């Protein structure tokens, strides 16, 4: 605005001087040059002066035109300056705005750099955790595999034990039935002998004594078999307890938790869904496992009780009376010539006919023994399924005929007393 005021004032100052100068030009003496012929000497001076005045007027006109041009240029320059000042102000404002935006961007950039550093640290931590979890998963899988192998070995041993127990039970039930048949035959023979030799009261009394002793021996064998079955049931229950179902369940739970955490870290949705389904069905799995263990224990107890009804008996030499010819009975003379004389303590042909095999082993043929995997304990590590190390305190498990076995001292004493009594008679 000040530049515009200066241009207006300069033009207003030049305007009156210009008008005066133009008026002087109109009243110039050059017009009256032809009329003034009188004063020739002074006219030359005046003409020279007029020429000078003309020159000055021309220069004045040139200067006025130049001044006007300069004034117009000045006005243009002032307008340009005003425009430039306006542009400068606008640019200053824009510069301030850009500076503020730049500062904001710098702040955001610094915040982003901080976030990036934090995220990089978190990424490194999560990577380390993922490595640790992968190591734990590998270790847990190896432990699970070893435990599954132990469980399979225990199942194989348990199945072999059950098979051997069933074979023993069937074998000894057959032996008991055979012995019962033999006892029936012997009773028939004894009854026939009592009918044929009713006069010999002393021999009948000896037979009764021997039968009583035989019954006592049978009772002793039954008691030994009951003890044997009780010890077998204890061994079976102990082997079932050593499975340690709760520790297996805890290991399964830890593995499921590790898998779930690993899947959450890796964002595996399918694995999480399957793991959630397994965890939801965990109660049913635990109940089925407990029911299976209970049924196995109950079946073992039922087998132990049923084995009490089918006891094993040793091949004992049965007693027969020496036949003496009776003069009153004619039929006995014909039979006595055909029959061999037998001692009172000779073995029955049904019992003595069996031959002892050369390769006698404490296990039934067809049963494969495998090494036990369970840990030895203080109470049950010394006991064995097939034989006992201390025959005086606990009875041994019955074996098939022809296999060496131990008998209690009381049973041996009774057999010796039977032999002595027969020799005396």
Swiss-Prot record:
Coiled coil, from the record:
68-197
| Statement: the UniProt record of this protein carries the keyword Transport | yes
Give me the stretches of Low complexity compositional bias.
Answer: 326-338
Q: What is the protein name given in its UniProt record?
A: SWI5-dependent HO expression protein 3
Describe the task this protein carries out: RNA-binding protein that binds specific mRNAs including the ASH1 mRNA, coding for a repressor of the HO endonuclease. Part of the mRNA localization machinery that restricts accumulation of certain proteins to the bud and in the daughter cell. Required for the delivery of cortical endoplasmic reticulum into the emerging bud.
Question: Membrane topology for this entry?
Answer: Peripheral membrane protein
Q: Which Pfam families match?
A: SHE3
One GO location term (cellular component): endoplasmic reticulum membrane
Q: Which family does it belong to?
A: Belongs to the SHE3 family.
Positions of modified residues (Phosphoserine): 343, 394
**Which source organism?**
Saccharomyces cerevisiae (strain YJM789)
The UniProt regions of compositional bias labelled Polar residues, in chain numbering, are 35-45, 345-358, 382-397
- Region annotation Disordered: residue ranges? 24-45, 322-425
Q: Is Transport given among the entry's keywords? A: yes
What InterPro entries does the record point to? She3
Compartments it resides in: Endoplasmic reticulum membrane
Q: Name one GO molecular function term.
A: RNA binding
Q: Which UniProt keywords apply?
A: Coiled coil, Endoplasmic reticulum, Membrane, mRNA transport, Phosphoprotein, RNA-binding, Transport
Cite a single GO BP annotation.
Answer: endoplasmic reticulum inheritance
């Amino acid at each position: 605005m000040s530049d515009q005021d200066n241009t207006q004032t300069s033009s207003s100052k030049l305007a009156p001087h210009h008008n005066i100068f133009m008026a002087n030009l109109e009243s110039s003496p050059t017009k009256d040059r032809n009329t003034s012929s009188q004063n020739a000497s002074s006219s030359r001076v005046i003409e020279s002066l007029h020429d000078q005045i003309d020159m000055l007027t021309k220069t004045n006109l040139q200067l006025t035109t130049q001044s006007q041009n300069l004034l117009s240029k000045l006005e243009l320059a002032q307008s340009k300056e005003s425009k430039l000042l306006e542009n400068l102000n606008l640019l200053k404002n824009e510069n301030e705005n850009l500076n503020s935006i730049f500062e904001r961007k710098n702040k955001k950039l610094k915040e982003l750099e901080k976030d990036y550093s934090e995220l990089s640290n978190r990424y490194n931590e999560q990577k380390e955790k993922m490595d640790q979890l992968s190591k734990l998963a590998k270790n847990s899988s190896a432990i699970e595999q070893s435990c599954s192998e132990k469980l399979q070995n225990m199942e194989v041993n348990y199945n072999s034990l059950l098979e051997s127990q069933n074979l023993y039970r069937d074998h000894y039930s057959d032996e008991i039935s055979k012995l019962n048949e033999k006892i029936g035959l012997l009773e028939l023979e004894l009854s026939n002998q009592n009918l044929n030799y009713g006069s010999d009261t002393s021999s009948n009394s000896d037979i009764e004594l021997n039968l009583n002793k035989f019954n006592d021996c049978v009772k002793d064998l039954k008691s030994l078999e009951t003890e044997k079955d009780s010890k077998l049931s204890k061994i079976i229950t102990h082997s079932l307890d050593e499975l340690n179902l709760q520790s297996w369940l805890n290991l399964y739970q830890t593995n499921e938790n590790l898998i779930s955490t690993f899947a959450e870290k890796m964002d595996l949705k399918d694995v999480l869904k399957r793991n959630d389904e397994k965890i939801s069905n965990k109660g049913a799995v635990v109940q089925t496992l407990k029911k299976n263990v209970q049924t196995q224990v109950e079946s073992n107890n039922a087998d132990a009780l049923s084995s009490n009804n089918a006891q094993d008996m040793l091949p004992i030499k049965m007693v027969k009376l020496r036949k003496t010819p009776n003069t009153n009975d004619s039929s006995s003379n014909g039979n006595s010539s055909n029959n061999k004389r037998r001692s009172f303590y000779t073995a029955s042909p049904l019992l003595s006919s069996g031959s002892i095999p050369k390769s006698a082993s404490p296990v039934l043929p067809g049963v494969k023994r495998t090494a036990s995997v369970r840990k030895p304990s203080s109470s049950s590590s010394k006991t064995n399924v097939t034989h006992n190390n201390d025959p005086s305190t606990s009875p041994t498990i019955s074996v098939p005929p022809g296999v060496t076995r131990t008998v209690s001292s009381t049973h041996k004493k009774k057999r010796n007393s039977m032999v002595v009594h027969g020799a005396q008679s």
